């Protein structure tokens, strides 16, 4: 079994062995930031016994000897990648181990849906994409945040505190991994993983109760991030490193133990004080403790993975070579534009240097005066202008296309076609081919997000900190108490085997695509009638019938009123009974309806029956109106009068009373 002293030594070894690799990746990632946001013309070179990003002077540098132009194509392609893989929702299903656990699964799904919104999980999954596509990797980690002050229980012998599980973003630069790591799957292939981050002493006091005195400042500890913060060109490095808050380096380390069945069984929180000894590791709290999370809490998302590499590559690293060539071509073109009509050619000793500087320019209102040495002296004249090759212009104009090609992006993904009149089948084939590389990234994202959701679900309902009152508050008062207790009765790992992420999370369809899909299914006979097609579209958020949408929303409000107030809402003849009746049936058919009480079901059943009776009465009235003559017109003869003398034929029917 792993001991605290052994855990401390392992962490010290990890910190010292990974320092050089971390320094290299800091420069590598900073270069990607420069090419995405800043002036480019950059490279990695040794400086002060370390690697750092260096720059050639460009057009914005007043010390330049000549101009260098930046035509940034990388930022546009990164933005496009981010928008292509931006999740719009989190759709998933919990898979229970047996039918016996159906109720905890259904109530757990309802609880977890609300909890994901509470911890802003969708925002975190969306924000990760910017860093992931720029530097190549980004980590979404599970967190435990202490809330409120400690409370004494059991006669003052024990102290308890509320903990709130959640999610947060972690940059790869904060991670400590063994330099021998050769895969991007740290949870599967490594034995020790740590996160090291500067934290203020107030943070340590708030979360660990440790009163640490130090001479180190937060700005000093952030210097390892300085070139990465400077990469965006906003001067963030100067502001962050100016902080004078007292701080130390805090490590959060997780260990595998061959003597434990549970993976990543141990965790240790510690800190280093660089002002005293930056290599000394001081454990916090109880030191080595059981891992409070379900497995390793770090979930990395990657873009372009390399063989035998611990991290992915971003789009800028793929496009840097092409971007440099484009910048060189643009710079050459602008230099030729500046040359105008060619250079001035002046006979020696006919003009002084001040006269040349004053008169030999492109201004039409400047007079050129020169001294003629003899009758054969030549006046100043320009040389022929530099000829711009059409091939260079074609190269520059084609740059956006071949730079997108390096990322496997295509114009057809933006709705552009290669020629007019191209068939829909050809466009769809091109689109599928263009989307194949992005689909591979989505599949990897799906697997990572499934692991993230499974871990977070087990963390949230962990019996160590899941409280009945907190779960009941999230679920609301309409959930029966016995179902809430059933949810907390067992460990989530006992009744949930895994999480399946649904395609709508990373592959959302536009309203027009959904409408086309439903229309096709209706045309093929998969959906029976047009009303079913309109209903399916409405449930997907595409409203093609205002009457159906209004009736659906109104009925949901009536259902909510009946369930919360316990009072019946009457039905009126003028309502759209068909749509509202369908809404009631749809509502009680959902898995969440398992939580309805018997009284709730009786109210909804009575409401449904009243809509049904009103609908039948309306249909009977319409039939009667169809069988009656219009006011002032004779009614048709009955069968009894057929063949008679029609003596009473032509009687006028009274007008229908409304």
Regions found by a protein language model. Name each.
Residues 235-420:
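Extended, charged amphipathic alpha-helical segments
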